[in-house]
């Protein structure tokens, strides 16, 4: 008997016929057959519920020979326990070395199914037409293939580990850069905050000095006028009393009275209202912040006054054709003034746009926002009550007239580049000079009554041009 056959026989002896695995706690029945204790007990438990011939009390049939065996006569087989343990530990006696179907040694390898088979499997219908190699030959062939795969996978593992190391380094460097940038942002903003606090203090000090100086001059002027008024009152009273006297009495003192009147020095200081405030409200960096809300605002040619020309510089064409070839009287077109509104209306959010102004010294113009339903056929006052929130400059005056009876904003120079900021939810529209970043004026109210449109207006052909985004606007002469 060769070693393989001996191993097979030994494996059979160490295998339970119920679970087909090596014995665990083997016991022997009265008839001499061996089973795992748990396997034979489970087999007999299942047999209790089956109908059949009457069994002796406490006796059950042997699963191998069907001979009746008392349950209490199960005897532990310690020798078989050692044999089963040896079979488990011996590499040549593993269960996987035998065919699970035929219990024959696995000596062949099916290349089609890529699985070991026994000689009985080789002749079976399932493998009869398959390519089959001896197990050792197949092992050598597949070992080479596996070694190639191992080499490839090790190379890939090295690449992966290299990339992992690079990614970890990149992650560390990135986190460090983020940390540095965060610290830099906090540091720079702290500098800006300190700078703004100092700038605020400086501007307020300048304004306070200007207030004190101007207030002193105004108070001195007022005091002088008060003194002059009292002197005039006194002389006037004396003259009125003297005119009521008898002729002789009146004429006796007339020389002194006239002398006092002639000696009175009259002073009339020039009073200019409103007094111009020289201190400019300029917040450093504010225009840059507002530009984060910048919109591409373009005038709507269908709303433009018939003689208001819109020229698109990029496309090199008129957006609104000259009046000779247009139909000027559409319902959306402004007819009372050389005005136009933007193509897009705003009913929420924050929006900022800029307008360049190449205007003459006596230009008439207006900028701002208006309701989408303002009167376009009639001349109306451009006021919030009529749906206009605009600033305007007229006839070269260096101030922006706003509302009737309001104090106009005084300018050192008319702006050539203006910014308009609309905060719809806050009910506020503000105007800035982009040239120096100064704030010119703001309209504030609880809420706007409806959608708003950017508003542009030129007064006459002599006013010059406005540039809105890439569109140039002027009045045809």
From Swiss-Prot:
Where, per UniProt, does this protein localize?
Cytoplasm; Lysosome
Q: Which PROSITE patterns match?
A: B302_SPRY (PS50188), ZF_BBOX (PS50119), ZF_RING_1 (PS00518), ZF_RING_2 (PS50089)
Broad class of enzyme this protein falls into: transferase
Its transmembrane ranges are: none
Task: Please tell me where this protein is predominantly located.
Answer: cytoplasm
Does the keyword section mention Zinc? Answer: yes
Which named protein is this? Answer: E3 ubiquitin-protein ligase TRIM17
